[in-house]
Curated annotation (Swiss-Prot):
Compartments where found: Cytoplasm
Function: Specifically methylates the pseudouridine at position 1915 (m3Psi1915) in 23S rRNA.
GO CC annotation, single: cytoplasm
Keywords tagged on the record: Cytoplasm, Methyltransferase, rRNA processing, S-adenosyl-L-methionine, Transferase
Protein name: Putative ribosomal RNA large subunit methyltransferase H
Gene Ontology MF term list: rRNA (pseudouridine-N3-)-methyltransferase activity
InterPro entries: Alpha/beta_knot_MTases, RlmH-like, tRNA_m1G_MTases_N
Catalytic activity: pseudouridine(1915) in 23S rRNA + S-adenosyl-L-methionine = N(3)-methylpseudouridine(1915) in 23S rRNA + S-adenosyl-L-homocysteine + H(+)
Protein source organism: Methanococcus vannielii (strain ATCC 35089 / DSM 1224 / JCM 13029 / OCM 148 / SB)
Binding site for S-adenosyl-L-methionine: L76, G108, F127, S128, K129, M130, T131, F132
Length: 159
């Protein structure tokens, strides 16, 4: 199975970069992981709805450029379905068993995701009703994917 994370924005803080590298290393024994960073658009201080829409559409273009092929697309959205770690592991395992070879997780930028991207999603996943910085969300997602593979393989994990 191949896991791809498409994330709007780049990680700037070294401690978050280090965490991403650590989880990439840990995940390498379970899956091929690819992380794609899409440039985030500069957002004015108080953007109008028109400005927000233009920014989201531009970011969506970058996301769609990387969604060519047979992917099962999971978007991270506040209004998505909340799963516990075992449910996420079951979903990943079920996709693998059903023959899905490529899962793509999409993390939006500071304004979230374009409706166009959300509409292309096979599954909308929510980690919380709270908002997290996209850089931190990437680390949280990687940890949960790692935890999922530990669960799938019957290996111990922290509860």
């Amino acid at each position: 199975m191949n896991i791809t994370i498409i994330s709007v924005g780049k990680i700037k803080e070294k401690y978050l970069e280090d965490a991403v590298l650590e989880y990439k290393k840990r995940l390498s024994r379970y899956t091929k992981l690819n992380i794609i960073e899409i440039s985030d658009e500069k957002t004015p201080e108080n953007p109008s709805d028109v400005e927000k829409s233009k920014i989201l559409d531009k970011e969506a273009e970058g996301i769609f450029k990387n969604l060519k092929g047979d992917f099962y697309v999971v978007t991270l959205e506040i209004l998505g379905k909340e799963l516990d770690s075992k449910e996420l592991a079951k979903n990943i395992n079920d996709l693998s068993i059903s023959g899905k070879k490529n899962i793509v997780f999409v993390i939006g930028g500071s304004l979230g995701l374009s409706q166009k991207v959300s509409e292309k999603s096979n599954f909308k996943l929510s980690f919380s009703k709270m908002t997290f910085p996209h850089q931190l969300m990437r680390v949280i997602l990687l940890e949960q994917i790692y935890r999922s593979f530990r669960i799938i393989n019957g290996e111990p994990y922290h509860k």
